[in-house]
Amino acid sequence: MNGPPLFQASKPVFLGSAALIFAVIFFVASSPSLAASVFSGVQSFIVRELGWFYVAAVATFLVFAVGLALSSMGRIKLGPDDAEPDFSTHSWFAMLFSAGMGIGIMFYGVAEPVLHFSSPPAGDGGTIDAARRAMQLSFFHWGLHAWAIYAVMGLALAYFAFRQGLPLTPRSALHPLIGDRIYGWPGHLVDIFAVLGTMFGVATSLGLGVMQINAGLNYLLGIPVTITVQVALVAGVALLATISVASGLNRGIRRLSELNLTLAVFLVVFVFAAGPTVFLLQAVMQNTGAYLSEIVGRTFTLYAYRPNDWIGGWTLFYWGWWISWSPFVGMFIARISRGRTIREFVVGVLLVPSGFTFLWFTAFGNTALSMELSGAASMVAAVEANVAVALFQFLEQLPFAVITMTIATILIVTFFVTSSDSGSLVIDIITAGGNIESRVWQRVFWALTQGLVAAILLLAGGLAALQTGAIASGFPLAVIMLLVCYGLFTALRQEVQRQTNMQVAMPVASGMGHLPVPWRQRLSAMLHQPTRERAVTFMRTVVRSALEEVVTEIRARGLDAALSIDDEKVTFTILHGNEEEFRYDVSLRGVVLPAFAMAMLEGEREGPERTWRAEVSLHEGGQGYDILGYTKEQVIADLLGQYERHLNFLHMQRTG
């Protein structure tokens, strides 16, 4: 017996992505000094010539996400109309909460506010006003803009995968623009750019992570801080991630994620308790207010009248980093958000992770600034000497330093492993055309490649090379994401138009497609509580017969129609060339018998308190009404009524 194929992927995407990534690896490995020079030139060019584009793109993503949530499109579900959320609101919030954590906040939680305080982009450093502006800038870089980028990509992936039935890959978001060409080279190129962005974005995080692990081990065990040690750490931790991938330890990774959440919450609560608690509670409120009050002006600030290098090393680096991470984080939040409305999705994704990040930066950043201003510790000197060491020198000033530094080091390692494992999974799904059940070796390949890219970038210039990799890889993805916004808006506008022009068919009382129904039949249908056996008989003798007649007639008129039949579901489809197909499903569903109908029980049932419904679904999901009890002519009338609405919708699309 032949087993599954050894290679389960989209060959153009897999091979194209691998070739480009290894071309970069070969270039950096063979000429590290030249590579460092090229990276520096690329970063300078992007900052000088394309900084405005990054700023405009990220502003667009935030306005677009908020606009969708506030518009009538916000009511549309990420899935069929009758889909229920896969996770409870509490569990969903918890997963979004965990998405807001990562290697980045460990690396920059102390360092970024201190660096902005000592060397602000404008004005004098080392002052109370500089401290206030430092927290504003940190919130700006890690707040709503970052999560708007993720929300746009996640929303597009969720909508087109769960509501339109397209592959769970970035190419699907361009379907409204290029149609089925997403399955050809235009779609392959989109997915290749998504893979490159994810690869270099995750590699940037891994590089930052090993720099900080090295700093922690130096503090705890005296291990020297060198590139050699950091490359060895990349290899070691990437190996751990590879083992988890090869072993299929989904439960283990889930437990690691839960451990991440527990340790991160412990650290932030500890700092709030051990630090200046009342000041921190006041600061989180004031920081949030200051951030929100200046968000518009800050969004569009490019320091055009007084150019400096600050924006390239900070704001543009972050925008490129977040954009390069968008397929990774976007796919995660898409997969956990099926059944949510667009409004729920945007509000949750923007506010929950941002809220946790604000708490983290206030706890670590404001406490570090308080130490500096009070003279309790020289945090500026520590950070300027070695950014990666900042967290550990900060924790050294608080009680139980050895314990908290050990916990912080463990947390960075677990973040590293889960990021690498999840990143390799996302890249594998994209290169496999949306298939989540591809071969294990493919996922192992991407896990090892991530570690290799991180190590090579460290050898090519450390933090500067990592920053350049993030900024450069984000540019093509930013262009794609703008097209994604347009494609998603086009699809949602059609969706609203469909909802306007295709009103839900009413149940029996409406007359079913203009066919009069005697009142006694209406009453009988309303009170009827059929068994499963009778429901299946109805599907076989009435629904199937009715739809077979319509299929025959439709085909006789030269249209392409199809019918799919089993005992509990019948699906009728009419194709319209390049226009949207019409689909009419009738499915049996068991429901709890209403209390008033208990006395009507008759016959054998699968449960003493269950009855059955024959519910209608269209392309956009369940319509919420039951046709069990209709005659054959009434079923045909209902189908034609829905088809008439669909044709009207297609007409409205053609005419504008």
Question: In which residue ranges do the predicted regions lie?
Answer:
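Membrane-embedded translocation segments of transport machinery
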Residues: 194-340, 347, 352-405
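Membrane-water interface regions at transmembrane-helix termini and the short interhelical loops
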Residues: 1-6, 31-46, 65-86, 134-141, ...
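Terminal cytosolic tails of multi-pass membrane transporters
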Residues: 1-8, 70-80, 349, 361-397, ...
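Amphipathic, interaction-prone secondary-structure segments
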Residues: 549-603
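Helix-loop-helix connectors at the membrane interface of multi-pass transporters/channels
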Residues: 1-8, 12, 167-185, 209-232, ...
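N-terminal alpha-helical transmembrane segments of multi-pass membrane transport
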Residues: 1-130
